[in-house]
Amino acid sequence: MEDFVRQCFNPMIVELAEKAMKEYGEDPKIETNKFAAICTHLEVCFMYSDFHFINELGESVIIESGDPNALLKHRFEIIEGRDRTMAWTVVNSICNTTRAEKPKFLPDLYDYKENRFVEIGVTRREVHIYYLEKANKIKSEKTHIHIFSFTGEEMATKADYTLDEESRARIKTRLFTIRQEMASRGLWDSFRQSERGEETIEERFEITGTMRRLADYSLPPNFSSLENFRAYVDGFEPNGCIESKLSQMSKEVNTRIEPFSKTTPRPLRTPGGPPCYQRSKFLLMDALKFSIEDPSHEGEGIPLYDAIKCMKTFFGWKEPNIVKPHEKGINPNYLQAWKQVLAELQDLENEEKIPKTKNMKKTSQLKWALGENMAPEKVDFEDCKDISDLKQYDSDEPETRSLASWIQSEFNKACELTDSSWIELDEIGEDVAPIEHIASMRRNYFTAEVSHCRATEYIMKGVYINTALLNASCAAMDDFQLIPMISKCRTKEGRRKTNLYGFIIKGRSHLRNDTDVVNFVSMEFSLTDPRLEPHNWEKYCVLEIGDMLLRTAVGQVSRPMFLYVRTNGTSKIKMKWGMEMRRCLLQSLQQIESMTEAESSVKEKDMTKEFFENKSETWPIGESPKGVEEGSIGKVCRTLLAKSVFNSLYASPQLEGFSAESRKILLIVQALRDNLEPGTFDIGGLYESIEECLINDPWVLLNASWFNSFLTHALK
């Protein structure tokens, strides 16, 4: 980009832009997009004023070449491009001679014909958005705003465009040329995305009373009053590099910028302790489903009817027994709860008309499992404020857990293809504009790659369970409602299929606030023997409930079937996000689209078809101890989708913190790989803030392990 700027713009403009950046302590070699933006803005300001004069009669005239002796005065005074001191001197002088109101911010030009200051904007975004930002910042009706975009759009105060059509067309053509030149060098995308909005300055308002006392009390050292501090902040000149800015700060601050080299970063320290356990709201790769193809039974589509029909496809039920108890729970209660579900489903069958929903009898085992009457009694604060030793109960620090191999296996499985399609190709009608055609083509290619993916099954399962649970929580607050865990898909031949994974029993659900918790017991079918990795199933009581005949290469084999039972809980806000898990498809589609865009911008034509159909090309998928893993574009789509789905399934404060903080190191490492010589301070503090998020969450621990692999290979 730097080379492009030096070739594309007049040397005088380049020099002025460099001076302006240095005045603000910015380096044109590093902030190359900003360098290009400043040059573009300067050039537009100069073009705006070029050839515009005022003659002896005070009329505005356009003269491109003519009599050098004619008594002409430049119509526009150029303020942009001067150093700050000189620029303010010019503004003050104009205000004194023309009685114009002094602007709060340095404008770009003064128009002697219209007697007004002019603010020129050049934007890579929508003109009206940028116009509003400018107007918000300036807050003055006296300054005229004129915005140009790289797409040929413009917007001006009161639609008064000041200049003639031809002068404005010259500016638009030049901007379009700059855009084309950038695109041909693959620079446009990065330039377009790097634009920041206008910073707005808050209005001054008076602070009085308690707030004023608090403000005075919380001033940094060395300041006697809020006024002093305000005056200091207003006069804080942001020139010079970061160190000089820091040295201008309080004497308490002392820090040095350390160079960041290949040897600076160290691997993250991951916690020790027992292996981490499964904590998703439903089973993932270990789930087993009973299915019916081409369902056409009476009441098809009513969850309870579908569930009963699915249950009838299995004939290997046996007397259930506990094979892996829950360490802390009353395990016979879980066993009795399952027997109760079977018995009450059987009772339904004996009724003439099966109801649409089923509320379970409030037995002692269900009351225990759903925590009925377990909430501590609430006491009015007035009744206990005189108790001298009143305190919040001590809570233990969470026990640290180490990374276990099962979470990587879960992730690998989520990226795989199943033999069913879990989403339909959306029919959105005929495309009207060419861009819609490209967009729907990309969507169709992406859908084809992910519709059979296991992560997509998890999305549909999550959406169904959360929707059903939220509905039941609102419709049957006091009831222990039985909710089947169902999903729907299509087979390879296009036949419809309904699947049952198990059941949920919901507890009392008077959910007033978003974070109020509803307890539920989940009971899920599986063929996974919990005794192989008992640490994985710490939160579950597992029963053996039947034997299933499986077809294998050597004939039929009988395998024990298990039921994974646990008490769990969720809240309105979690269910709301769970219902919106389809967003994961959108997020990963957008990531793929930006890859397609980058490819298209390099080649200067739409590369969607080649991108998805070139089966020989491989793309980086992720890091492993072996190095950078690569795969087909379909594999990339499915991996990105699985990451997005796992971020939703394993959402937690630990994940939020880890993602936000570790990203900072990734950005610094990227800057190092781009030879931008990054500098840092308090890198130890950054590591601390990342490592305090590594406690016991399986998905966060796996991401930390990937992060360490990335560091190893990125800095070789």
UniProtKB/Swiss-Prot annotation:
Motif (Nuclear localization signal 1 (NLS1)): 124-139
KW Membrane (keyword) present: no
Binding site for Mn(2+) 1: H41, D108, E119, I120
Domain of life: Viruses
Keyword Phosphoprotein listed: yes
One GO-annotated biological process of the protein: symbiont-mediated suppression of host gene expression
Motif residue range(s): Nuclear localization signal 2 (NLS2): 184-247
Gene Ontology, cellular component aspect: host cell cytoplasm; host cell nucleus
Reported modifications of this chain: Phosphorylated on serines and threonines by host kinases, including human casein kinase II.
Co-factor: note: Binds 2 manganese ions per subunit.
Enzyme class: hydrolase
Documented EC number(s): 3.1.-.-
Main location: host cell
Record localization: Host cytoplasm; Host nucleus
Cofactor or coenzyme needed: Mn(2+)
Gene Ontology MF term list: endonuclease activity; metal ion binding; RNA binding
Residues the record lists as binding Mn(2+) 2: E80, D108
Keyword tags: Cap snatching, Endonuclease, Eukaryotic host gene expression shutoff by virus, Eukaryotic host transcription shutoff by virus, Host cytoplasm, Host gene expression shutoff by virus, Host nucleus, Host-virus interaction, Hydrolase, Inhibition of host RNA polymerase II by virus, Manganese, Metal-binding, Nuclease, Phosphoprotein
Annotated family: Belongs to the influenza viruses PA family.
Subunit relationships: Influenza RNA polymerase is composed of three subunits: PB1, PB2 and PA. Interacts (via C-terminus) with PB1 (via N-terminus).
UniProt function note: Plays an essential role in viral RNA transcription and replication by forming the heterotrimeric polymerase complex together with PB1 and PB2 subunits. The complex transcribes viral mRNAs by using a unique mechanism called cap-snatching. It consists in the hijacking and cleavage of host capped pre-mRNAs. These short capped RNAs are then used as primers for viral mRNAs. The PB2 subunit is responsible for the binding of the 5' cap of cellular pre-mRNAs which are subsequently cleaved after 10-13 nucleotides by the PA subunit that carries the endonuclease activity.
HAMAP family: INFV_PA (MF_04063)
Name this protein carries in UniProt: Polymerase acidic protein
Species of origin: Influenza A virus (strain A/Equine/London/1416/1973 H7N7)
